[in-house]
Regions:
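Conserved phosphate-donor/acceptor-positioning beta-strand/loop module used by diverse small-molecule
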Residues: 33, 46-67
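Hydrophobic anchor at the start of a short beta-strand
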Residues: 26, 52, 101-103
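Conserved GTP-binding G-domain of TRAFAC-class P-loop NTPases and closely related GTPase folds
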Residues: 61-150
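Conserved nucleotide-sensing/catalytic segment adjacent to the nucleotide-binding pocket
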Residues: 1-46
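Generic hydrophobic secondary-structure signal
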Residues: 20, 27-28, 54-59, 65, ...
Length: 150
């Protein structure tokens, strides 16, 4: 199992490297518990010209506990409570890292409600904006110049 996991991580790392080299859009899925790691990833992406956004899917502690209990692989309540507290505590810092304009909070407390269409619409709006960073604009210009020469 560890061998498979190690190989999977290696392949994922290579794919990420290629995506970053081509300046493709990427999605990082996280629990938002490790704000230092997220901050580091955000800074690295910004440094190469990425505009970054965060979708923060929020639930109450009660809903988190209830959903945990209905999963096939249940975590102890103490782990869920601790994680939820940490994530809620990190919300303000994450908003500062990503900026108000690029931080979307989704309320995911209602059972049976499909939040995906609403989230998809908001994300499309965020990513359809033209890049604003100097690095991104410069990279796009260089790539367009390369195409003209071919």
């Amino acid at each position: 199992r560890d061998k498979i996991r190690s190989k999977s991580k290696q392949i994922a790392g290579m794919q990420l490297g290629m995506a970053l080299e081509g300046r493709l859009g990427i999605i990082i899925d996280s629990t938002a518990r490790d704000v230092e790691k997220i901050s580091s990833q955000a800074a690295n992406l910004r440094s190469i010209g990425y505009d970054i956004h965060m979708v923060f899917v929020n639930t109450t502690l009660e809903v988190a506990l209830e959903r945990n209990r209905s999963r096939p692989r249940v975590l102890p309540d103490a782990v869920v409570i601790n994680s939820h507290k940490q994530i809620q505590k990190n919300m303000g810092r994450l908003q500062r890292i990503f900026g108000h304009r690029n931080f979307l909070i989704v309320d995911n407390n209602k059972y049976g409600e499909d939040v995906n269409p609403m989230v998809h619409k908001k994300i499309r709006g965020m990513i359809s904006r033209a890049p604003t960073s100097y690095q991104a604009v410069r990279w796009i210009h260089r790539e367009l110049e390369k195409r003209k020469r071919k």
